[in-house]
Amino acid sequence: SSRESPMKSISSHVLDGVRGSDAIDLRVSAYCLAASGERRKIAEVRTDMSGRLTIEVDTRDDDSETRYEFVFHGGEYFAEHALHELKSPIHETVIRLDLSKVEACCHVPIIMSPHTYSTWWSSSDR
């Protein structure tokens, strides 16, 4: 709608499934993906002391094909915490989001371990 704000929030709470704790200081890269194939980095952040992060994005110029991509650098995180001794081939977890139907905020929690991850969508926009 014309009153809809072009600024939207993407947030996550990352949990370390090996240690059963918040995934503190996990690197996450965020990209805007255009229908043309252009992939533009919009943020490089780390989770805070509670395993959380929030990225604000300006969707003013987005079309219906625009997507947002989160890259969770789990392999790097587990190697830094000496929890990657099983040599999992899963190095990054990628989540792509369509914000065209999201009014304000899209919250995507994720539980990660070296061999698996689980995620879901949590939003008041449902």
List each model region and its residues.
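Beta-strand-dominated extracellular/periplasmic modules and repeats
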Residues: 7-100, 107-109
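Short, Lys/Arg-enriched N-terminal segments with co-localized hydrophobic residues
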Residues: 1-6
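Compositionally biased low-complexity segments at domain edges in trafficked proteins
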Residues: 102-126
